[in-house]
Regions:
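Predominantly extracellular beta-rich ligand-binding scaffolds that present long acidic/polar faces
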Residues: 1-187
Length: 187
């Protein structure tokens, strides 16, 4: 549970989480349940593997607060039933966020590119092979075809997060196909 203000936090490449719980609650790449907290300038590259029923999000599991200038580029594998969203499992307000999370599960898993539940989003996008539904009552235009298409959104995403203290820059490193945009302090 988080009611905190989380800024500039990250979970990097070599972290893996294996879930064998009872299907209650929610798990996320950074926060399991965000209860009226704020998450800004954060990212997760975590791999989550769930062997039992799960509700999971690439960055946040259950979300009731604002998430701004943040992204998820990990992987969620659901081997039982449940709901998985590339960015959040459900809820809250998302501004200037993206997900390139690899999402997979059994036939009894609901998989959505951004969120499986109701969510409010502004300038949020996802890129995931085999997943076409953004979820959360969001338009299908939130799906981008590749890293170049996401990079084309950088100006509008930065405009949406202006004043947050963070901005996106293009990633020119070797992992740019998976993480096309990096978040950094806006100084």
């Amino acid at each position: 549970w988080s009611k905190a203000q989380i800024q500039g936090s990250s979970i990097d490449k070599e972290v893996s989480f294996v879930y064998r719980g009872n299907g209650e609650g929610a798990i996320g790449g950074l926060v399991g349940w965000n209860v009226q907290g704020t998450i800004t300038g954060c990212y997760s590259l975590m791999t989550i593997t769930a062997f039992t029923a799960v509700n999971a999000g690439g960055l946040v599991g259950g979300n009731e607060g604002p998430v701004t200038a943040s992204f998820a580029a990990g992987e969620i594998v659901a081997k039982a039933s449940g709901n998985i969203g590339g960015l959040v499992k459900n809820g809250g307000t998302l501004t200037g966020c993206y997900s390139t999370s690899v999402l997979s599960g059994t036939a009894s898993v609901t998989i959505c590119g951004i969120s499986t539940g109701s969510v409010t989003a502004n300038e949020c996008y996802f890129m995931s092979d085999g997943v076409s539904n953004p979820g959360g009552n969001l338009p299908t235009s939130t799906k981008v075809s590749d890293a170049a298409a996401l990079i084309d959104k950088i100006a509008s995403m930065n405009q949406a997060i202006a004043g947050s203290g963070y901005k996106y820059v293009e990633n020119t490193g070797t992992d740019s196909a998976r993480v096309p945009l990096l978040i950094q302090p806006d100084e």
